[in-house]
Amino acid sequence: MGLLDEEKRLSDTDDGIVDIDLKVTQKKRFRLDGDNNRILELDTSDLSILNRLEPAYKKLLKLAKEASSKMDFSDDASVEEVLEKAAPLLSNTDKKMRAIIDELFDANVSEVCAPSGSMYDPFNGQFRFEHIIDVLTNLYTANLNNEFQKMSDRISKHTKKYTH
């Protein structure tokens, strides 16, 4: 089939739009804790995450600090009083943190990685959001190192024939 035939076949779709698949975005699928209901899809070749990481992390730390400072209750406060004041604050903080994390990774990370609990829950001596970011950014680092090595090998192969 020639190029024109292929283009005609593609343009005969119901909406008349020609679909082009460049295959430049390769999302990888990760299963969390062996749970088939917790599949995370990430484009671990997305270098723009470097631009998003620092501002997102600063916002998350600021939210955690603000929530902690507002959780200072007097020693004589009743459990009901603490819960009444803390619940909406913590819920609102968690929603903001989840939105930031999802934007950072350009995926539904918060729901898949932390379906219950909150992003500021303590986990292994750090906030849950910190643990999630550490684990996921390591996936990006490993993939990007691998991709850059492939590029280096390809460039080396092509330049070798001209230098020897």
What positions do the PLM features span?
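Short acidic DE-rich linear segments
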Residues: 1-16, 150-164
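Extended, low-complexity, charge-balanced
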Residues: 19, 27, 96-102
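Charge-dense, low-complexity intrinsically disordered segments
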Residues: 47, 84-88, 123
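Short, flexible coil/linker elements and helix-boundary hinge sites characteristic
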Residues: 71-72, 88, 146, 160
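Intrinsically disordered, low-complexity acidic Ser/Thr-rich regulatory segments
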Residues: 79-96
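C-terminal charged interaction modules
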Residues: 99-164
